[in-house]
A protein has these predicted regions:
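Short S/T/G/P-rich N-terminal loop/turn motif that feeds into the first structured element of a domain
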Residues: 1-215
Length: 215
């Protein structure tokens, strides 16, 4: 079971270049203890100049080992003190942890430059139906150019705890546009209709696009 830890930040005015540099430094410090580290900038749906620093781990045990090591890393602790100081180019605003939910399928391997994120709240007693619909969506988007389609659940995220997050990646905005067109085919419209009933399995909370910034 893959798990993740993510940090949302807000870049101060005129500090974008410095913020990317700090993220690169963080990736090196954190990455030496394991995990797949990635950095994104808000494209649409999120607050302007927001950033997403995400670390994926293969299992809860891997995350636990990494976090214990991070807690004892003096260099990282000094770095975090600087990042949280008044001269930091970024203000850290939120942190969350979560896990990937099993959908009975294997996601198409790969990464894209654009991350699409849809956050929802499952209605009571509708988990099985929600997972089934998420699996259908993942199959559909991957058949139309996306990769790494999966369903996550926020486990430690403040008021967002328990929400599900459907994500996938596409190569670029042209690929995103092609996928958008596919949603208006017969198959895409039929899939959308399942979430637009009077009593859906889940209710959408937000949708966002994030652009990956190579570190």
């Amino acid at each position: 079971m893959r798990v993740f830890n993510s940090t949302i930040g807000k870049v101060k005015d005129g500090q974008m270049e410095a913020a990317v540099g700090v993220a690169g430094e963080a990736a090196k410090l954190v990455g030496r203890h394991g995990g797949d580290v990635r950095f994104f900038m808000a494209g649409a749906g999120a607050e302007i100049n927001s950033t997403l620093f995400s670390i994926d781990y293969e299992s809860p045990e891997a995350l636990g080992r990494a976090f214990d090591a991070l807690g004892e890393d003096a260099e990282l602790q000094a770095f975090m003190a600087r990042v949280n100081g008044p001269d930091s180019p970024t203000v850290l605003t939120a942190q969350a942890m979560g896990m990937e939910l099993p959908l009975g399928r294997t996601a198409k391997a790969g990464k894209g430059g654009v991350l699409e994120v849809h956050t929802s709240r499952l209605n009571p007693d509708r988990m099985e139906e929600g997972l089934s619909q998420a699996a259908e969506v993942c199959e559909f988007v991957e058949a139309n150019g996306a990769v790494n389609a999966r369903l996550l659940q926020l486990t430690y995220a403040g008021l967002g705890s328990g929400l599900t997050v459907l994500t996938w990646e596409v190569e670029n905005m042209q690929a995103h546009a092609r996928l958008g067109t596919a949603w208006f085919t017969d198959a895409g419209l039929a899939l959308q209709a399942k979430s637009m009933t009077a009593n859906p399995a889940s209710v959408q909370v937000s949708s966002e696009l994030w652009n990956e910034i190579p570190l």
